[in-house]
A protein has these predicted regions:
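Hinge/cleft segment of the Venus flytrap/periplasmic-binding protein
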Residues: 23-65, 216, 307, 313-385
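Extracytoplasmic "Venus flytrap"
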Residues: 26-28, 34-93, 104-116, 133-137, ...
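Hydrophobic alpha-helical segments within soluble ligand-binding/sensing domains
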Residues: 46-54, 115, 168-194, 208, ...
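An alpha-beta-alpha
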Residues: 67-75, 86-90, 178-228, 319-353
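Short beta-strand elements in bilobed, periplasmic/extracellular small-molecule ligand-binding domains
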Residues: 92-109, 194-196, 217-236
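Hydrophobic alpha-helical
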Residues: 122-124, 128-148, 213, 227, ...
Length: 385
């Protein structure tokens, strides 16, 4: 049985072990999760998997807490989805429960030095915890240690940080990239030319997923990767960059492996080029789903790597559980990719949908990183609400 078939079975029914992982701390994670989501054959070698320094730690700050969100970028619809969840749903319910007072947001526009400065300022101004998103895995490390020394923990959503003082939460990106590549290769018959569209090079979320795609395609000798294009996880950039490449190259393309958040723009570029509408990986952009909803034979599934609202709630829940002293076992809590078929998409995307929609699908925290799932990674796991 191929990994693709195993992944499909696991995601549709239950986790099935595919390999054993020999690591003391991972031995404390249930085998079905460990052998699938933490399979070393599909793990970024730089993913932190040691015991968390927060295992016997509890915040000494009184409730309610203020969390600083040091965002690295604001220029795409994915980040918009994060903000909508944090301020539209999460903060109000946590305020009502007496857990949070506020979430303070900064933006650094992909400049590490600015993000570092903002994290230090947030720490010095008295926030009780920090979350960051999609950041350089190494550059922030001294600042994370600085915050830790002040009693302020840092959680990363959508990509790992290598500091021993960081908490990382995300999908297993290398596994997800491999799955997307395997799915696309099988969809186009195991042969042909493909274009990979990565997100923001240099961020762990982009790089890990990109490597997973390369590894997946490498297992198909008749598949050729003819281009690797960065699109900054932004539809407008994806459209412009792909249009540029398509106009400059006559190479036949049989499929597109697009990191989600850029797929609406990539789809627009392909459609406007006059080329055949060949399979493309979709992962949550409603504009792209609009096309698929009305062309149901286009592909057979969407594969989610990071539904924005759910990814944000995932990180916040882990951070707050840690601050409450629940005993975080491991440095990185990882989840598997999630998928939906066209019938599901048609249930929430209307026929008269907007191809230029700026909305992004969220699958629900109960499907992405449920309280039951998170409990496996804490010594004394308990839902916040």
């Amino acid at each position: 049985m191929t990994l693709l078939k195993k992944l499909i079975a696991m995601l549709a029914v239950s986790f099935i072990g595919v390999a054993s992982v020999n690591a003391d701390i991972l031995d404390e994670i249930p085998a079905d999760i460990r052998d699938f989501v933490y399979d070393p054959d599909f793990m970024d070698p730089n993913q932190p998997l040691g015991e968390s320094v927060y295992r016997n730690w509890k915040s000494d700050r009184p409730l309610p807490w203020t969390i600083g969100y040091a965002s690295s970028y604001a220029g795409n619809l994915w980040r918009k989805g994060v903000m909508e969840r944090l301020y539209g749903d999460y903060l109000p319910k946590m305020k009502e429960a007496g857990i949070l007072n506020d979430i303070v947001v900064t933006q650094s526009n992909l400049k590490d030095a600015v993000q570092i400065q903002q994290m230090r300022q947030l720490t010095d101004q008295g926030v009780d915890g920090l979350i960051v998103c999609c950041s350089n895995p190494v550059a922030l490390n001294p600042t994370i240690e600085y915050a830790y020394g002040k009693g302020v923990p840092t959680a990363s959503m959508t990509g790992y940080l290598t500091s021993e003082y960081a908490i990382s939460t995300s999908v297993n990106y290398k596994l997800t990239g491999y799955y997307i590549a395997s799915w696309l290769a099988e969809t186009i018959g195991g042969e042909g030319n493909v274009v990979i569209m990565e997100g923001i090079p240099g961020t762990s979320a982009s790089d890990s997923q990109h490597q997973g795609m390369l590894d997946g395609f490498a297992e198909y000798p008749d598949i050729t990767v003819v281009a690797e294009i960065a699109h900054m996880w932004t539809p407008q950039i994806a459209q412009a960059e792909l249009q540029k490449w398509l106009s400059a190259n006559t190479t036949q393309v049989d499929g597109f492996a697009v990191q989600s958040s850029g797929e609406s723009g990539a789809l627009n570029a392909l459609e406007s080029s006059g080329r055949d509408m060949v399979p493309m990986a979709l992962g949550g952009g409603i504009g792209a789903f609009c096309y698929w909803r009305n062309n149901p034979d286009f592909i057979d599934r969407a594969i989610y790597a990071w539904p924005p609202g759910d990814d944000a709630e995932f990180a916040m829940n882990v951070l707050l559980r840690t601050m409450k002293g629940q005993g975080l076992k491991i440095q990185s809590i990882l989840v598997p990719p999630y998928e939906e078929d066209v019938e599901t998409i048609q249930s929430f995307v209307p026929e008269d949908c907007d191809r230029n929609s700026s909305e992004f699908r969220t699958v629900g925290i109960e499907n992405w990183a449920s309280d039951e799932y998170l409990n496996n990674f804490f010594d004394n796991g308990e839902a916040l609400l």
